[in-house]
Amino acid sequence: MDGESIKPSSQPLIQTGDDEKNQRTITVNPAHMGKAFKVMNELRSKQLLCDVMIVAEDVEIEAHRVVLAACSPYFCAMFTGDMSESKAKKIEIKDVDGQTLSKLIDYIYTAEIEVTEENVQVLLPAASLLQLMDVRQNCCDFLQSQLHPTNCLGIRAFADVHTCTDLLQQANAYAEQHFPEVMLGEEFLSLSLDQVCSLISSDKLTVSSEEKVFEAVISWINYEKETRLEHMAKLMEHVRLPLLPRDYLVQTVEEEALIKNNNTCKDFLIEAMKYHLLPLDQRLLIKNPRTKPRTPVSLPKVMIVVGGQAPKAIRSVECYDFEEDRWDQIAELPSRRCRAGVVFMAGHVYAVGGFNGSLRVRTVDVYDGVKDQWTSIASMQERRSTLGAAVLNDLLYAVGGFDGSTGLASVEAYSYKTNEWFFVAPMNTRRSSVGVGVVEGKLYAVGGYDGASRQCLSTVEQYNPATNEWTYVADMSTRRSGAGVGVLSGQLYATGGHDGPLVRKSVEVYDPGTNTWKQVADMNMCRRNAGVCAVNGLLYVVGGDDGSCNLASVEYYNPVTDKWTLLPTNMSTGRSYAGVAVIHKPL
């Protein structure tokens, strides 16, 4: 074959008929880019083919221009433009610390970045500088996931400085939606005048009562009283005093020294008092910012069911999502607990006293829904199980109960501001297995068992915090111990319970205005020692027992139709003596 050359064939290897089109295949290897970047990172670690050194502080980082330019518009502009850095072998980056820059260049090569509480505040601005927008978004997402009443205002300020528009809106909405808890924190007290005005003037502010806004203003002024006193009138302009109850205006607002000493503020108070003197139809004709009800965005809620007997005391806590009709297990209690009092106060769920399977306890655990975590706080002064618990005027009241030997008439209150318990006036009757509720600023203790007469009780007492006195109100129509007590639309409901061996399904409701009880529709099932809560105009009764077994079912009452409906989904565990609270669904 000497002198001959190999010529390419003019015929394709695969031939098709004349009537068929030429065929071809394009393939994309999804792993190719990842492998390529992995090799480039290995070359960088060995300082092979590197053509630039990036310097920040005392940290020097070898890299490849083409890789940096491909992933960062900042570096692309630097290396392809007319700046001196386009040809420099060593480039200093200012306004970024060396460790952060190293992490970001690692990200360019590996697509991996760790965002933490410790580094997010330096990582986000550095990612913004290098125009690594995915990292910047990761930082924003992380901060959004960390929003909490104690930090949302700080995150809002950070987002504002760095023009993170979505995060700014999310943090601001969070502050509005959790205002009763936000106002208690150092961040709120450190806000500027304009920032406070902007927050409390929002129609979206979520408060159960305008009292919270008034209290927030007083707290902010008193935090630096000498320098802030002059701003009192400007702040009170945004407090919707006409929407406050008349008793609160007279007993609290009018008696506040900061109001008494300011003529403009006194004018706002007079305006509110005049508003209350008007008939309802005339009130509706008054159009000014202080008479306009706030219209907060409705936050989704979840129901927390804490501990209970199943059949022994348990640590389990379940969470019900109303929107999704789903039960989930959340963080367990630190120790077994049943027959406890459970309430929601200042953004947290409190589990108070109870029985741990062997002893009645004084201890109190607090649940943070954002962190999904329980912590312990100051213990009560007395051991109490089968107590009643309720919140009134920012105090948690522990009412009656059983200490292991006798029923209790004593009542103590807890202030989360001081982390201290103190006794208030005792009830007239010892009551264990007592139900409690708060209506129109009064605390009610309903039924129970007195231990002395060895009978279940039909009597009801009312506590007035202004006078520190308990007085009897109208009796229920029947004796009820272990009744589930809840409040809906300003009325007090007593559900189920028992009288000796007889477990009830009957329900009656108390109207404070007329001091009368009336029967409403029976529940679907007999229940005693059930948890009760009100959500979205419905009254939920959770678990309990029917005298023979613990119940996993939940039913709710609609006062419009006077009907009870069973939830389609049961708890995973039948439990009696569980506590129930409703919280905003954590983000």
Curated annotation (Swiss-Prot):
Molecular function, one GO term: actin binding
- Phosphothreonine modification, residue list: 295, 375
* UniProt KW Cytoplasm keyword: yes
What metabolic or biological pathway is this protein involved in?
Answer: Protein modification; protein ubiquitination
All copies of the BTB domain together span: 50-117
The protein's role, per its UniProt record: Substrate-specific adapter of a BCR (BTB-CUL3-RBX1) E3 ubiquitin ligase complex that acts as a regulator of ion transport in the distal nephron. The BCR(KLHL3) complex acts by mediating ubiquitination and degradation of WNK1 and WNK4, two activators of Na-Cl cotransporter SLC12A3/NCC in distal convoluted tubule cells of kidney, thereby regulating NaCl reabsorption. The BCR(KLHL3) complex also mediates ubiquitination and degradation of WNK3.
Q: Indicate the quaternary assembly.
A: Homodimer. Component of the BCR(KLHL3) E3 ubiquitin ligase complex, at least composed of CUL3 and KLHL3 and RBX1. Interacts with CLDN8.
Give the protein's recorded name. Answer: Kelch-like protein 3
Task: Specify the species.
Answer: Bos taurus
